[in-house]
Curated annotation (Swiss-Prot):
Localization of this protein: Cell membrane
Membrane topology, as annotated: Multi-pass membrane protein
Name of the featured protein: Uncharacterized membrane protein HI_1126.1
The keyword Membrane is annotated on this UniProt entry: yes
Native organism taxonomy: Bacteria, Pseudomonadati, Pseudomonadota, Gammaproteobacteria, Pasteurellales
Family: Belongs to the peptide transporter carbon starvation (CstA) (TC 2.A.114) family.
Principal localisation: membrane
InterPro entries: CstA, CstA_N
Gene Ontology annotations for the cellular component aspect, listed alphabetically: plasma membrane
GO biological process: cellular response to starvation
Ranges annotated as spanning the membrane: 4-24, 60-82, 87-109, 130-150, 197-217, 224-244, 282-302, 320-340
Pfam families: CstA
The keyword ATP-binding is assigned to this record: no
Length: 371
């Protein structure tokens, strides 16, 4: 049953899409939208944070805001659990993550583009507002560090890797040679070692974040974020294309789920369903849900939705923007979970990589290899 893993992947993607049209519509009815109600984008329209934008542009910005590197790194690590990881992404997205994001966005629209701490204080009292503000500050600090450090590490690795290619240090499929040369200081970029290159990228990304925050939303966020969001989608489509083409390759086929099929034989339904059960030292509960959070359910998204709630032109666009962006993030998470399942030769190789710490280099190598 060689096609079983591929069918499972596309089944999960299909369920997510169906969930958007069916359950998303149910959630929209529960909220009771009013298309005739003026949104904060028109009520305030201060030319800074509040201004109307097209729903496609807002959707791409919202996708990038809530996604980042979360639905890439988490699902790759979560691939250790096999196909049950993809089941969690589907269920989590449809019934929890997308619902959470939709209501956060729509509540913000209904209350003048208010943030979650303000809404918590309005309905639950000042003590709750203080608590949520403190919690949000701590979490945003932690998430901000990750969202600066992880791209900087990745870009630093890619920079050193590409420079290694230019020096002739990389032959086809020999990424480890470059890695060892980089770590040993044998490869430098303009006289800088890897740590310095990463520090430079960190400064660049941090400066970009500050600039994007201080300027009006349409100057940087409204112009650059949609492009980055489109690139995120394009990259995921490229991953699927690479997997499918490699899967049907006559010379070097890549099985979609080869990490759970160690004996090299065809994957049977019995073997497939074994991966929906607890596997001894890697219990599904609660580790799976902690490993894959951003791709299925994340409370951090509540801090991002007011940004786009202030630019939404009509309440009827909320399902596409907020619910739809989370469903799209779920699709991206499914793609990268499949990348993790297809990259390693067997379950032990994947386990060893995770046990040793899945560094940015290894994640970068996965992307390059599958591409």
């Amino acid at each position: 049953m060689r096609s079983l893993p591929m069918l499972w992947f596309f089944f999960c993607v299909t369920v997510l899409i169906i969930g958007y049209f069916i359950y998303g519509k149910i959630i929209e009815k529960i909220f009771v939208i009013n298309p005739k109600r003026q949104t904060p984008a028109y009520q305030v329209n201060d030319g800074v944070d509040y201004m109307p934008m097209s729903k496609t542009k807002i959707w791409l910005i919202q996708l990038l805001n809530i996604a980042g590197t979360g639905p890439i790194f988490g699902p790759i690590l979560g691939a250790l659990y096999g196909p049950v990881a993809m089941l969690w992404i589907v269920i989590g997205c449809i019934f929890a993550g997308a619902v959470h994001d939709y209501f956060c966005g729509m509540l913000s629209i209904r209350h003048g583009g208010a943030t979650m701490p303000y809404l918590a204080g309005k309905f639950l009292g000042r003590p709750v507002k203080v608590f949520i503000n403190t919690l949000a500050l701590v979490l945003l600090l932690l998430v901000g560090v990750v969202f600066v450090a992880s791209p900087a590490q990745l870009m630093g690795t890619i920079t050193m890797d590409v420079f290694g290619v230019s020096q002739g240090a990389l032959v086809l499929g020999d990424a480890e040679a470059v890695h060892h040369s980089v770590e040993a200081g044998g490869i430098k970029v303009w006289g800088m070692d890897k740590a310095t290159v990463v520090a430079v990228w960190t400064a660049i990304i941090f400066a970009y974040y500050i600039l994007a925050t201080l300027l009006p939303v349409d100057k940087i966020i409204g112009r650059i974020y949609p492009l980055f969001g489109a690139l995120l989608l394009f990259m995921s489509v490229g991953m699927v294309y690479g997997l499918v083409v490699s899967h049907f390759s006559a010379t070097d086929p890549i099985e979609f789920f080869r990490t759970i099929n160690a004996d090299g034989e065809g994957l049977t339904w019995a073997k497939f369903t074994q991966n929906f059960q607890v596997k001894g030292d890697v219990p599904i509960w609660p580790l799976l849900f902690l490993t894959i959070s951003c791709g299925a359910l994340s409370g951090f998204h509540a801090t991002q939705t007011p940004l786009m709630a202030r630019c939404t032109e009509n309440e009827s666009e909320g399902r596409f923007i907020f619910y739809g962006a989370m469903i799209t993030e779920g699709v991206i998470a499914l793609v990268w979970c499949m990348v993790g399942l297809a990259f390693y030769e067997n379950p032990q190789a994947l386990q060893d990589a995770i046990s040793a710490g899945c560094s940015m280099l290894k994640l970068c190598m996965i992307v390059r290899y599958i591409s």
